[in-house]
Amino acid sequence: MNFLPPIGQALDCLSLINCWGGNLLFPYSLGQRSLLVADVMQTPTARVYGLLSRVPAVVVGDPDLDMRFWALDNGADIAGQERLLLKLLWIKLDLAPPTAAIAEEIDRASECVKATEWRDVVDDTSAGDAPAASVLTATIRYRSFDTVRAELRAAFQNHLAIAHASGLRRAT
């Protein structure tokens, strides 16, 4: 069975799924977040993993932390499902699973991007505390679906080629 859509469709979907449960000053998608996460990452060979880290949201959605805990309390391990989908994605793309160092770099980049989103993108910030990570110097601005879609597809091709050229292929 194939649980993931073709990668082009998955990237298109990321361009359409809003972050922050729609609590936004302007349309801002998981695709834009994915591009920023990859850009923030210091290791060029690891950027494909950061770029694709939110692909499971195409299948399971992008629930907030409260929903994740509620689901877990009721027998649905969303994070576990996301990990499984990422494992399938790495196999599909002939990528080695990310190392612990790559996973940590994705986490650091994601936290930095989320802190910047809090400053630039989130509409009502009164309901919570700003993420503790440092923010980017650049301001996040609105970009159209077509722009994000094209940038995601180009970044995917570029980052996958770099990862494969560096030897980050799945062991057979």
Language-model segment annotations:
Residues 1-172:
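Metal-dependent phosphohydrolase cores
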